[in-house]
A protein has these predicted regions:
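Short, small-residue-biased leader/transition segments that mark boundaries at the very start
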Residues: 1-8
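Accessory cap/linker subdomain of secreted extracellular hydrolases
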Residues: 12-48
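Active-site nucleophile elbow and catalytic-triad environment of alpha/beta-hydrolase enzymes
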Residues: 66-83
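Short beta-strand/loop motif that positions the catalytic acidic residue
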Residues: 86-87, 93-95, 99
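Catalytic active-site module of serine/aspartate enzymes centered on a nucleophile-bearing elbow/loop
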Residues: 117-154
């Protein structure tokens, strides 16, 4: 990030962490509305404001912003540079074709570096695990691993 981007990110994080609800709640609601818009292929209705929804929105926004101000606690290319630590394990990478948060090229690069990984591209999905196609692919992958890892039937 360049200086001005860090200033925006850091100042937004400060607003989310401000103890005054008049400061942190509008920021948290906006954060979550933006994330909802980016993470799903089809427009979603934002949840109504309630005490429970506000608590969830605030905790989600603070947690995600904390990761961003700490550069996700990763060095540049750390995952791909250390992929050899897990290439002996089987994996399924579920990717939404219209994911603008983690674009498909990132999943393709991961699978190219991980011989035992299988890529499942979901044509009608973005990023969210709550989208029907992503959810079905995740459940299917889990079922395949359950079968693969279960002891043989007697």
């Amino acid at each position: 990030l360049v200086g001005s981007e860090m200033c925006i990110r850091d100042s937004y994080y400060r607003r989310l962490c401000d103890p005054d609800p008049a400061q942190h709640m509008p920021a948290a609601r906006a954060w979550n509305a933006y994330e909802l818009a980016c993470s799903t292929l089809r427009p979603q209705v934002a949840p109504a404001h309630s005490r429970a929804e506000d608590a969830r929105a605030l905790s989600t926004a603070r947690l995600e912003a904390h990761y961003f101000v700490n550069t996700l606690f990763l060095e540049e290319n750390q995952l791909l540079d250390r992929i050899d630590c897990i290439t002996h394990l089987p994996a399924t990478v579920v990717q939404g074709r219209y994911d603008v948060i983690c674009p498909p090229i990132t999943a393709q690069r991961l699978v190219a570096a991980w011989p035992k990984a299988r890529l499942m591209m979901v044509d009608d999905a973005g990023h969210s695990a709550l989208e029907p196609g992503i959810r079905a692919a995740l459940v299917g992958a889990t079922e395949r691993f359950k079968t693969m890892l279960s002891p043989p039937q007697k």
